[in-house]
């Protein structure tokens, strides 16, 4: 895909949704961090359903840590990999409480040092909370980038590296949100909705439905 097409696609998505919002519910930096950790291999719907109850009981590093591992597991048991996630959350809560004075760190190195926080999670936190022009590549973003030929790659790392190079700076802040929403509701894994796609004419997917 050429530079002009990419710019047109992003312009269309920008006009349609100037201020895209993440679909995870949160009211603090720490709540978002926990929600993103929980969202790995899960859906935002399940995470929101879970945190709606959990955050009424505990929603700070101190209260989560005091809740304890077993009680936390009970609250998040409907989420995939809940045993591992519970342990990571307890450990991360303790580190943020004791090392960072209950404040979520705002740089990649410190974020990725937290249990349960990888590059994708760090990118989301940096982007949403701290307005950094990072691009998180999840399954939706990966699929849309490859399918449309916006930025092809065999893995998320390659796609992210390409996106950093080809996405104009003015669009980088919202890129992740636009593409994840497009992948979640339009360019879905199954039953692709080409008939209502805003970027249909610019898409280079050879099997798109006319």
From Swiss-Prot:
GO BP field: base-excision repair, AP site formation
First-tier enzyme category under EC: lyase
Entry similarity comment: Belongs to the Nth/MutY family.
Single GO term (MF): DNA N-glycosylase activity
Cofactor mode of binding and number, as noted: Binds 1 [4Fe-4S] cluster.
Enzyme Commission designation: 4.2.99.18
Keyword Metal-binding set for record: yes
Cofactor (UniProt): [4Fe-4S] cluster
Binding site residues for [4Fe-4S] cluster: 187, 194, 197, 203
Function of the molecule: DNA repair enzyme that has both DNA N-glycosylase activity and AP-lyase activity. The DNA N-glycosylase activity releases various damaged pyrimidines from DNA by cleaving the N-glycosidic bond, leaving an AP (apurinic/apyrimidinic) site. The AP-lyase activity cleaves the phosphodiester bond 3' to the AP site by a beta-elimination, leaving a 3'-terminal unsaturated sugar and a product with a terminal 5'-phosphate.
Highest taxon listed in the record's lineage: Bacteria
Name of this chain's protein: Endonuclease III
Cited SMART domains: ENDO3c (SM00478)
Keywords for the protein's UniProt record, in alphabetical order: 4Fe-4S, DNA damage, DNA repair, DNA-binding, Glycosidase, Hydrolase, Iron, Iron-sulfur, Lyase, Metal-binding
Catalytic activity, as annotated: 2'-deoxyribonucleotide-(2'-deoxyribose 5'-phosphate)-2'-deoxyribonucleotide-DNA = a 3'-end 2'-deoxyribonucleotide-(2,3-dehydro-2,3-deoxyribose 5'-phosphate)-DNA + a 5'-end 5'-phospho-2'-deoxyribonucleoside-DNA + H(+)
Record domain HhH: where: 108-127
Organism from which the protein derives: Buchnera aphidicola subsp. Acyrthosiphon pisum (strain APS) (Acyrthosiphon pisum symbiotic bacterium)
């Amino acid at each position: 895909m050429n530079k002009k097409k990419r710019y047109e696609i992003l312009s269309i998505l920008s006009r349609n949704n100037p201020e895209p919002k993440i679909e995870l519910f949160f009211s603090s930096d720490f709540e978002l961090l926990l929600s993103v950790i929980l969202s790995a291999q899960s859906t935002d719907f399940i995470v929101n359903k879970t945190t709606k109850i959990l955050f009424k009981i505990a929603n700070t590093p101190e209260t989560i840590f005091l809740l304890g591992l077993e009680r936390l597991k009970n609250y998040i048991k409907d989420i995939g990999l809940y045993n591992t996630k519970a342990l990571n959350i307890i450990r991360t809560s303790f580190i943020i409480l004791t090392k960072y004075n209950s404040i979520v760190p705002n740089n990649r190195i410190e974020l990725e040092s937290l249990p349960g926080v990888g590059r994708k999670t760090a990118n989301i936190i940096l982007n949403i909370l701290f307005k950094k022009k990072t691009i998180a590549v999840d399954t939706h973003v990966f699929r849309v980038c490859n399918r449309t030929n916006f930025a092809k790659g065999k893995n998320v790392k390659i796609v992210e590296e390409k996106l950093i190079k080809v996405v104009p700076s003015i669009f980088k802040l919202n890129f992740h949100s636009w593409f994840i929403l497009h992948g979640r509701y339009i360019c879905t894994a199954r039953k692709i909705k080409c008939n209502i796609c805003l970027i249909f004419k610019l898409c280079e997917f050879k099997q798109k439905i006319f």
